[in-house]
Amino acid sequence: VSTTSKAFVTALDNHGIGLVSGVPCSYFGGPISELAHWPDIPYVPAANEGTALATAAGSRLAGRPAAVIAQNSGFGNLINPLTSLVLPYQIPVLVFVSMRGWPKASSGEPQHHWMGRVVPDWLDSLDVPHRMLLPDGPGLDEVLEETRPVLASGRPAFVLVAKGAVEDEKAVGAPDAETRPGDGDLPDRDDLVKAVLAEVGPEFVFSTTGYLSRSLFNQGDRPRNFYMQGSMGHVASLALGSALARPSERFVVLDGDGSVLMHMGALTTVGHFAPPNLVHVLFDNQVYDSTGGQATTASTTEFDTIARGSGYRRVQYVASTAAVRPAIQDAFRAEGPTLLVVRGRAGGAAGERASGAVTVPEIARRFSAELTAGQVPLS
């Protein structure tokens, strides 16, 4: 029987958890929403899974037991503080990880093919105890009881959560979004993509994982589009490598606030090398739209100020649908790198993912063939 969101958070409360930090997954959309108004357990939206684990460890050091909620596709981000902080310092933290792409790789998206099957083996190799929470298995209270002696011994305990083990309840999005004086009719992601495509000619376009890539694919698929599936937070770095390798071409990055927050240090690298042929478009709707509309921390983050301080030559803030196309035109005429922060709203058509029609390897190969004129094939 699936665990309801309220039962999930109640179980955490009953087991003494006093703080939860995490990165959203649709498997946990309901519990994260429930935590938003739970009086005794603050929820800390983390930039990435590693910072979530570190935050939980810090809470435990201060005497407040803590838990982490994460998607298995972000397990790689979590490995570093797991192996260099939590394990060597023997800090007991409870970690919930969704098992996308498990038990069959075909049950998830392409980026879950590898991580979906290796998390239990990796935990075994690190001698980290883990339990499964299944729709037809022992309930959450029983599973958490099994973690008590593990945590009491100073070790982390992992609960791997299968699809359907927690009820798929509608997540509640961000509260009223923060706006600035002069903000107008905010675009949704489809409005943004439509405006960008109206101005793009020979440019190469990288789009971040999630609904932005779906919107780009459904509105204007072409070989010069690279659709990220997974690798959240790395699209700007991917584009930077191409921009430095091919200075005669122009590159556009379609990014999101959650993605930029995940690895925001990449902005300083882009600013340091300052490729003049890079236009970085950041769609800031202040939610993780692809996982159910959970709030990011972007409402208190001034991306334009950060980009200026990181060395971007040009930074512009746009907050109306009508202003997007002129801003793209200005960016194409100017020397980059440009960061165009587009204050947007949640919503837009979900659409089909690109890999439903074009395989992930083919996305890379056709893009590279266009970029290198077929002279340096990937394989």
Residue ranges and their predicted role:
Residues R155-L160, G336-V342:
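Active-site regions of oxyanion-processing enzymes, predominantly non-cytosolic
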Residues V205, F251-L254, V281:
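Residue-level marker for buried hydrophobic side chains located in beta-strands
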Residues S320-R333:
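A short, acidic, amphipathic alpha-helical segment used as a generic capping/interface helix at domain edges
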Residues S73, E249-L267:
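DG-centered beta-turn motif at the end of beta-strands
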Residues G18, P65, P276, R313, ...:
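Short acidic/polar active-site loop segments enriched in Thr and Asp
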Residues V1-L240, L244-E249, T321, G348, ...:
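Thiamine diphosphate
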Residues N277-Y317:
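A contiguous pocket-lining binding segment that forms or flanks enzyme active sites
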Residues T83, I91-V93, H263-D284:
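A short alpha/beta connector and helix-capping loop motif
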